[in-house]
UniProtKB/Swiss-Prot annotation:
Hydrolase recorded as keyword: yes
Organism: Clostridium botulinum (strain Loch Maree / Type A3)
Family: Belongs to the PTH family.
One GO biological process term: rescue of stalled ribosome
Active-site residues, record numbering mapped to chain: 19 (proton acceptor)
HAMAP family reported for this sequence: Pept_tRNA_hydro_bact
Record gene name: pth
Name of protein: Peptidyl-tRNA hydrolase
Site residues, Stabilizes the basic form of H active site to accept a proton: 91
């Protein structure tokens, strides 16, 4: 069983912002596998389904980004999911737009949502899909809560689809295979 967590902030004003990439990827996986994310529990919205023979729980925490660990630990404990089977998808400023990076473990890298998840799980050993949003020329908060330009949006839509495939690959083939397949791929305008 896998817990697939997309990080983001709830509310219409955050829809399609850089910081909500995790929510967008989870929505793509949900659509592909006909999973309705319509239940409220674990301080978030979630739905259950299958990828092949694996049961998956798709979770969108409603705690706001910096408290995402509260939602993740509740769902993980309820379903008794191993940390190695918790996949977290989130935006990453240290990666260029058009790229993603799959990792099996690692530090928070300055991302407060991941930092909070690491604190609650008491571990940094969980797979993640880091989706590049590029470096800001402006205030970081304004940047991550801002929307992509039209040209960037074209690239991001393709990256979101690729990120969903990377999540699915982790479930079906394992983290190493997903890393080999998706790390280093760059989508251009």
């Amino acid at each position: 069983m896998y817990l697939v967590v997309g990080l983001g902030n709830i509310g219409k004003e955050y829809k399609k912002t850089r910081h909500n990439i995790g929510f967008d990827v989870v929505d793509i996986v949900a659509e592909k596998y006909n999973i309705e994310i319509n239940r409220q529990k674990f301080k978030g919205s979630y739905g259950e389904g299958r990828i092949g023979n694996e049961k998956i729980i798709l979770l969108k925490p409603s705690t706001y980004m910096n408290l995402s660990g509260e939602s993740v630990i509740e769902a993980a404990n309820f379903y008794k999911i191993d940390k190695e089977n918790i996949i977290v998808i989130y935006d990453d400023m240290s990666i260029d737009i058009g790229k993603l990076r799959v990792r099996g473990k690692g530090s928070a890298g300055g991302h407060n949502g991941i930092k909070n998840i690491i604190q609650h799980l008491n571990s940094d050993i969980f797979p993640r899909v880091r989706v590049g949003i590029g470096q800001p020329d402006e205030n970081v908060v304004n940047y991550v809560l801002g929307k992509f330009s039209k040209d960037q949006r074209e690239v991001i839509e393709k990256v979101l689809a690729m990120s969903a495939k990377a999540c699915i690959s982790i479930v079906e083939d394992g983290v190493t295979e997903a890393m080999n397949k998706y790390n280093g791929v760059k989508i251009e305008v």
